């Protein structure tokens, strides 16, 4: 009997905690349909971005409540998208707006503050590291006022990435937006780990969007030492999370980066991957009825993509910067990929990884011929740029004639430039390769480049 009373009292305590936070008037709708990922709800009128609670089995217990976001409306129906993957919903389930501090809880406001440093959170700012939740008083809007392009600080300072081939041949500027293009299995995660450890930045923000959940912990354990983690923030929305969580995770990471940029910090933002972000938006757009126009992608996906990328970069004059590395997944047999082409057109440069290099044990597997940094001519001296171009020419010349050389069809002395390329290529390949735990700062990389030709 005592055990039964104890259980009843525990239930009453749960109900009491819920009732304390309930407003005097509750607006309520009901679930009348599910179309793909989208829930159709009648009886409510709420702004886009509002979080609603869908009650399973008409229960008010936390365990039976599911959160969903208002993403649009159709005539008198609200369109909601679930924040988690749930399959046991029933018709006529009760739907109510979530209340926080006396007002509707809007997903477009999440915690952004210094307390996030050293933390690992999901796409909604909820802790994944078993530490305390960030107080809602730090919530700010995820949207931000765009900076007048005439007021932005130009990219004029070199960013030391600690990677010899990038420092020497694809020099990155502080505030630059770079794409890392690669298919699976080419050492992309290893290269990102090296950038995270060695890049000279005040704050590091890692946005892991739509990737394998197993890799999230492995990446954090192998890359984020205590020193690096203390100045880092990790936002994780793995592939098993909802598409809404994945899109929010990317936007949330960018908003945090903007916050620190506005405080005059130099921020390194690594987003892995931009392709998963676009795919998540595609699922949402198709679910609410948008028509696909390019390889299954609706037009709104590209506007979202450009909007996200353009938020990175330098801030106003004499303020901080966001140097962003966006990974883009490519299909080697696909001649045209709309996401890759769109990203390439708007980014300030691209680093392409080569399967041929990776399979031969050449790491990092950067294809120097096809990679480019568009700001490099503006931030390095003329001799450095000249040596980098000369390096690329020699590699390109050797690659074009490699088959002739390998089969013995080329006769030495026929082409002096090719003779020089054959002599230098072992040194050039050694310059391009670098161990995972090896760091090469900008000055050392520059000296190594010069020494190849002197």
Swiss-Prot record:
<dbReference type="Pfam" id="PF00006">
    <property type="entry name" value="ATP-synt_ab"/>
</dbReference>
<dbReference type="InterPro" id="IPR050053">
    <property type="entry name" value="ATPase_alpha/beta_chains"/>
</dbReference>
<feature type="binding site">
    <location>
        <begin position="182"/>
        <end position="189"/>
    </location>
    <ligand>
        <name>ATP</name>
    </ligand>
</feature>
<keyword id="KW-0067">ATP-binding</keyword>
<keyword id="KW-0066">ATP synthesis</keyword>
<keyword id="KW-1278">Translocase</keyword>
<dbReference type="GO" id="GO:0046933">
    <property type="term" value="F:proton-transporting ATP synthase activity, rotational mechanism"/>
</dbReference>
<dbReference type="GO" id="GO:0030254">
    <property type="term" value="P:protein secretion by the type III secretion system"/>
</dbReference>
<dbReference type="InterPro" id="IPR020003">
    <property type="entry name" value="ATPase_a/bsu_AS"/>
</dbReference>
<keyword id="KW-1006">Bacterial flagellum protein export</keyword>
<dbReference type="InterPro" id="IPR003593">
    <property type="entry name" value="AAA+_ATPase"/>
</dbReference>
<keyword id="KW-0963">Cytoplasm</keyword>
<keyword id="KW-0653">Protein transport</keyword>
<dbReference type="GO" id="GO:0005737">
    <property type="term" value="C:cytoplasm"/>
</dbReference>
<keyword id="KW-0813">Transport</keyword>
<dbReference type="InterPro" id="IPR027417">
    <property type="entry name" value="P-loop_NTPase"/>
</dbReference>
<dbReference type="InterPro" id="IPR000194">
    <property type="entry name" value="ATPase_F1/V1/A1_a/bsu_nucl-bd"/>
</dbReference>
<comment type="function">
    <text>Probable catalytic subunit of a protein translocase for flagellum-specific export, or a proton translocase involved in local circuits at the flagellum. May be involved in a specialized protein export pathway that proceeds without signal peptide cleavage.</text>
</comment>
<keyword id="KW-0375">Hydrogen ion transport</keyword>
<keyword id="KW-0406">Ion transport</keyword>
<dbReference type="GO" id="GO:0030257">
    <property type="term" value="C:type III protein secretion system complex"/>
</dbReference>
<keyword id="KW-1005">Bacterial flagellum biogenesis</keyword>
<dbReference type="GO" id="GO:0016887">
    <property type="term" value="F:ATP hydrolysis activity"/>
</dbReference>
<dbReference type="InterPro" id="IPR005714">
    <property type="entry name" value="ATPase_T3SS_FliI/YscN"/>
</dbReference>
<dbReference type="InterPro" id="IPR040627">
    <property type="entry name" value="T3SS_ATPase_C"/>
</dbReference>
<dbReference type="GO" id="GO:0044781">
    <property type="term" value="P:bacterial-type flagellum organization"/>
</dbReference>
<comment type="similarity">
    <text>Belongs to the ATPase alpha/beta chains family.</text>
</comment>
<keyword id="KW-0547">Nucleotide-binding</keyword>
<dbReference type="GO" id="GO:0005524">
    <property type="term" value="F:ATP binding"/>
</dbReference>
<protein>
    <recommendedName>
        <fullName>Flagellum-specific ATP synthase</fullName>
        <ecNumber>7.1.2.2</ecNumber>
    </recommendedName>
</protein>
<dbReference type="Pfam" id="PF18269">
    <property type="entry name" value="T3SS_ATPase_C"/>
</dbReference>
